[in-house]
Structures are given as C-alpha cells and as structure tokens.
A protein has these predicted regions:
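Cytoplasmic/organellar membrane-interface segments at the starts of transmembrane helices
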Residues: 128-131, 183-256
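Hydrophobic transmembrane alpha-helices and their helix-loop junctions in integral membrane proteins
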Residues: 3-4, 8-189
C-alpha cells in the first residue's frame, strides 16, 4: 500500500512546490533558470523511458515510468504557458490514478505469483482475465492512449511547451514513442503468449479487489473522454501563475 500512497500523494509534493512556492515566491529566479529546468525535464523524460525499457522487475518498471512522466509535468510547469501549466496540473491528477492502478494490480499479481520478475508472468489473460484487463487499461493510460486520462494532459503539456520551446517539445515527443516500448512489451509478456508454468492456478481478482480498483479505472476512462470539469478548476490558477511569473501567454487560454 505504501507504493500506491506515494504515487497518489507524496510524489506530487515536489511539483506542487514548484508551482506554489518556487514560481510564485521567486518569479525572477524561475524565469532565469527556466531553460535549464526545461532541459533537465527533457532528460528526465528520455532517461526514465530508457531505464523503464530495460527493467526486468515489474515494480522497477512502473517506478521508472514515473520518472519519465514527471519530466513531462516539470516541462509543462516551466513552459510558462497556460496550456502547459494546465496540462501539468492535470497530469498530476491523472498520474495519481493511472500509476497507482498499475502498482495496485502489480501488487496483487506479485502476491499471487510470489515474484516480481516480468518473465515469471505470461498468459494471464487466459487465467485471470479481469486482472489482465485492468492492468491493460492502466498501462494504456500510462502510455497516454487517446480516450484515457493521461492523453489529454500529455497533449496539453506538449502543445503548451511547443509554443515557447519547440525543440524541447519535439524531443519530448520521443518519450511517447519510448512509452510504447516500455508499456507494450511488458503487456505482451505478461498478458499474452503461452501461460508460464506456475501461473495455471492463479486466482482472478476477488470482490474486494474489484471494488477497490473499479473506481480508479472508471476515473481513468471518464477523465479521458470528459476532462472539462477538472480543467475548469485548474485553468484560472494556471493562468494566474503564468501571469504572476511575468510571462505573456503566447497561446489561447485552455477552454476558451
């Protein structure tokens, strides 16, 4: 449960602090160091993605995907545009659901299998179809598949960044391509193919686990199709932060 709490709440403290304190209390310093931070954010996106691709442990895989995702969040914050800032704020919300869902399901898988090594899983869609489908949906949200929650926020971050730092945004899109590798390859190994010996008698999600994961999956889907209520809450603050930092927004305001 510690991993889920960390992903849902604690790892957002840093990016919240960037918005709430760094930019608003030290706008001149933030403006000075913005190019450096954008560069570090792009490095984080690419580094986290490559490290995730090389992981053989499922929890390590999910952890490194978060490094890549937080690169997108930081890039959106320091793009200093209303779209980028709104996308970063929305990304924090979406990340809390999609990655926490991955950790939850991975925890249930490891509890049943007694292992966290990706190669020890295989053919789970035949043995535990409900658990397989929930893992697939959470993974596709982490991939930012259109129609799921992370797509909207990642799109806003990249569009908002492109208007001020086009090179960073273009390089950042490489993270999307790499995400397809670090999500789809494990999905293929874990859910498809022949059933790995030792997985034949694994049990599917019980009622308690289904009740726990169902609201998270529902939010992931709803936020992908209709993020407007959350954006309506986020946009005014995002626009004000950009103005307070002394930047003129080069793009139309989100939702206008």
């Amino acid at each position: 449960m510690g991993s889920e709490m960390c992903i849902r709440d604690r790892d957002k403290v840093g990016t919240y602090g960037m918005i709430r304190f760094c930019i608003q209390l030290f706008p001149d310093a933030s403006k000075t160091f913005t190019p450096l931070i954008i560069t570090l954010a792009v490095i984080s996106i690419i580094y986290g993605a490559f490290m995730a691709i090389g992981q053989k442990d499922i929890k390590g895989l999910i952890a490194f995907t978060s490094i890549s995702h937080f690169g997108f969040i930081t890039m959106g914050i320091f793009a200093m545009t209303s779209q980028g800032m709104s996308g970063a704020n929305l990304y924090m919300v979406n990340h809390g659901f999609s990655t926490a869902a991955l950790f939850l399901i991975a925890g249930w898988m490891m509890m049943r299998r007694g292992s966290s090594t990706i190669s020890d899983f295989g053919g789970l869609q035949r043995v535990t179809p409900v658990m397989a489908w929930t893992f697939f949906i959470a993974g596709m949200s982490s991939l930012a598949l259109p129609g799921l929650s992370s797509f909207v926020s990642e799109f806003l971050v990249l569009v908002g960044t492109y208007t001020r730092y086009p090179v960073a945004a273009i390089i950042g899109t490489l993270g999307i391509i790499l995400a397809a590798l670090y999500i789809l390859i494990p999905v293929q190994k874990i859910l498809h193919g022949p059933t790995t010996p030792g997985n034949e008698n694994l049990t599917d999600l019980n009622l308690r686990e289904k009740i726990a994961i169902a609201p998270v999956i529902l939010v992931i889907v709803l936020m992908g199709f209709y993020p407007k209520p959350v954006l309506d809450l986020i946009n005014p603050t995002s626009e004000q932060v950009v103005i307070n930092a002394g930047f003129s927004d080069p793009v139309a305001k989100v939702g206008k």
